[in-house]
Amino acid sequence: MPYPEQFIAPMRAELTRLGVRELRTTADVDAAVGAPGVTMIVVNSVCGCAAGKARPGIALALQHDRRPDVVGTVFAGADIDATDRARAYFEPFPPSSPSVGLLRDGKLVFMLQRSDIENRDARQIAERLTAAFDQYCESPARST
């Protein structure tokens, strides 16, 4: 049973207020991944490491001058089908939330799993993400 929307709405808003697009359906996920360039998909979560580490780290990383062309998010435990679709693009990595995947032209090029998040602070997570942005994003972001 999905989480009640009124419970998770503030957690969704932590990313959407940064310009991150919600990907609530499989079609939304496929469209984001099919966009040219680099797509970042965040698997958002209710857990403490999402609240205290992942979302703040993503917020810091998105201030970097070089960012993915498309930035989207699914919510584990709420956007069930969309989350499953995003995780299918993240194979061979096992399902993990929170997590962040970078895809270039539909192919996974970078993955940040829960195990990479839970023992780091927001600044360290941002550093990992911005290093990946510098490596895989060809130019400053056009849109989110």
Task: Walk through the language-model features, giving the residues of each.
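Non-catalytic, surface beta->alpha helical segment in thiol-disulfide oxidoreductase systems
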Residues: 94-141
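Short helix-loop-beta junction
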Residues: 7, 11-14, 59-68
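Short acidic (Asp/Glu) patches
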Residues: 83-97
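Local sequence-structure signature of Cys/Sec-based thiol-disulfide redox active-site neighborhoods
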Residues: 31-65
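Thiol-based oxidoreductase modules, predominantly thioredoxin-like and allied folds used
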Residues: 43, 66-85
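Conserved strand-to-helix beginnings and helix N-cap segments that scaffold or border functional pockets
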Residues: 51-56, 83-84, 122-123
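Structural signal for conserved beta-strand scaffold positions within catalytic alpha/beta enzyme cores
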Residues: 24, 73-75, 102
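N-terminal leader/targeting and pre-domain segments
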Residues: 1-37, 137-141
